UniProtKB/Swiss-Prot annotation:
Paired cysteines (S-S): none
Stated name of the protein: Phosphoribosylamine--glycine ligase
Cofactor(s) it depends on: Mg(2+); Mn(2+)
Keyword Magnesium attached: yes
Entry's EC annotation: 6.3.4.13
GO biological process: 'de novo' IMP biosynthetic process; purine nucleobase biosynthetic process
Residues the record lists as binding ATP: 133-194
Co-factor: note: Binds 1 Mg(2+) or Mn(2+) ion per subunit.
Reactions catalysed: 5-phospho-beta-D-ribosylamine + glycine + ATP = N(1)-(5-phospho-beta-D-ribosyl)glycinamide + ADP + phosphate + H(+)
Enzyme class: ligase
Transmembrane spans: none
HAMAP family linked: GARS
A Pfam short name: GARS_N
Length: 423
């Protein structure tokens, strides 16, 4: 069968690569894809992004189903459009995707359904926001209401930082429409984890646990990014935390969306903050697989992903299980110079073949020129995954592979997975 994956990042490379491992799958088209998906066996890039063009392509090629990688097409209603055209697609509707595309929607939804999260208030007026922050004190978290590619969250450790973030979003319009409303919420202490599940509207199939590293620099310093690395499984998600996350967050969310008359289908990702007592709180929802969590998680999936997605689209997730490798996977992101602000593009990347002999290189912000050189083409350029019998081995494998790669201004964290090693 022929499948389609929408997107051009590392997450989409990993999803398409895993789907292509199925003996049932002939070709996975990736729209628009990157330099990695262009050369991966059984994968083929197509330069289409408009929903109608994609729908026509699916009809012409008899695509069995489509998987949506990134948040932007979901928020733009790609699932609604495909379903209206009678095509199978895995992802949430535009309404359901508001769990990610509007922080205010998500917080109000959590309050309504008693899902644990930080206390919050929403503001469109800068003066009112400044007053609220002065009353609450720091540390405090300022979030752009809309989609901001993972960079719309400012964890303000001082009042000055909080006031500056409010001005950036509400007065200086630095986030555009995404920051025209801000959600201000209490700062939560604890350790973060990514809890990702597949949902068919009613049933839930959990993916392996993982932990992302949001900050740019070692020791969780520097600016927030889309994610600088991840590992799976995440030891902070103990069996008790796992049960609580399912029963207090995931299942009430799925039931709540159904009660709202908008069943959630697709990947649902709860960003958790696990406090000292082991209680999980929801920091955010994403309506798709995480990036870079997808890369290590897919590296551990032994099941046929196409079977899981088909079951989910058909409302039969309760009839399948996911089998996981007992190994640990560590993925490290290589980012371009000046990421996350104004990443430099167009630098030649060398050493990819050598790196792929040691680990697995997933492409994100890459493109190829006429000569066949692979060039940087975005903020997060590559994610290098290593597998090992324990976290330390997997980390050594990932960094061993990464050392083969070079491009001008390459930056990466050297401490990915150290939290798990030091536990």
């Amino acid at each position: 069968m022929k499948l389609l994956v929408i997107g051009n990042g590392g997450r989409e490379h990993a999803l398409a690569w895993k789907l292509a491992q199925s003996p049932k799958v002939e070709t996975v088209f990736v729209a628009p894809g990157n330099a990695g998906t262009a050369i991966e066996p059984k994968l083929q890039n197509i330069d289409l992004t408009a929903h109608q063009d994609l729908i026509e392509f699916c009809r012409k090629e008899n695509i069995v189903f489509t998987v949506v990688g990134p948040e932007a097409p979901l928020a733009a209603g790609v699932v609604d459009d495909f379903r209206a055209a009678g095509l199978k697609i895995f992802g949430p509707t535009q309404y359901a995707a508001q769990l990610e595309s509007s922080k205010d929607f998500a917080k109000a939804f959590m309050a309504k359904y008693n899902i644990p999260t930080a206390q919050y208030q929403t503001f469109e007026n800068a003066d009112a926001a400044h007053d609220y922050v002065n009353q609450k004190g720091a540390p405090i978290v300022i979030k752009a209401d809309g989609l901001a590619a993972g960079k719309g969250v400012i964890v303000a450790m001082t009042l000055d930082e909080a006031h500056a973030a409010i001005d950036d979003m509400l007065l200086d319009n630095k986030m555009g429409n995404a920051g025209a409303r801000v959600v201000i919420e209490d700062f939560l202490q604890g350790e973060e984890a990514s809890f990702i599940v597949m949902v068919d509207g009613n049933n839930v199939l959990p993916m392996a646990t993982s932990q992302d590293h949001k900050r740019l620099l070692d020791g969780d310093k520097g600016l927030n990014t889309g994610g600088m690395g991840a590992y799976s499984p995440a030891p902070v998600v103990t069996p008790v935390v796992y049960e609580r996350a399912m029963n207090e967050i995931i299942l009430p969310t799925v039931a709540g969306m159904k009660a709202e008359g908008h069943e959630f289908t697709g990947f649902l990702y709860a960003g958790l903050m696990i406090d000292q007592s082991g209680a999980p709180h929801t920091i955010e929802f994403n309506c798709r697989f995480g990036d870079p969590e997808t890369q290590p998680i897919m590296s551990r999936l032994n099941s046929d992903l196409s079977d899981l997605v088909e079951a989910a689209i058909d409302g039969k997730l309760d009839s399948v299980t996911a089998e996981w490798s007992p190994q640990t996977a560590v993925g490290v992101v290589l980012a371009a110079q000046n990421y996350p602000e104004t990443p430099k593009k167009g630098d030649v990347i060398s050493g990819l073949d050598a790196a792929n002999q040691v680990g697995k290189v997933f492409h994100a912000g890459t493109t190829a020129n006429e000569k066949g050189d692979v060039l940087t083409n975005g903020g997060r350029v590559l994610c290098v995954v290593g597998l090992g019998d324990n976290v330390a081995q997997a980390k050594a494998k990932a960094y061993g592979a990464l050392e083969k790669i070079s491009f001008d201004g390459m930056q990466y964290r050297k401490d990915i997975a150290d939290k798990a090693i030091n536990r």
